[in-house]
């Protein structure tokens, strides 16, 4: 039962997220031999003002 965690900066459309989840599920199923119904994809969207790189807030 594979679990895939994805963290992204917010801003993608529902359609983009849906397509991404479908593509990830397909890739894991193909390469890990797992049935699609057993693959879990968890998407966490980070607020743009809650992301830092190199010690500096990204805005």
Swiss-Prot record:
It comes from Enterococcus faecalis (strain ATCC 700802 / V583). Signal peptide: none annotated. It comes from the Bacteria. The active site is at residue 2. Belongs to the 4-oxalocrotonate tautomerase family. This is Probable tautomerase EF_2859. Keywords: Isomerase. GO terms for molecular function: isomerase activity.
């Amino acid at each position: 039962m594979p679990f895939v965690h994805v963290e992204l900066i917010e801003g993608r459309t529902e359609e983009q997220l849906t397509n991404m989840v479908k593509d990830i599920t397909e890739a894991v199923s193909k390469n890990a031999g797992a049935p699609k119904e057993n693959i879990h994809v968890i998407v966490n969207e980070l607020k743009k003002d809650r992301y830092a790189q190199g010690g500096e807030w990204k805005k």
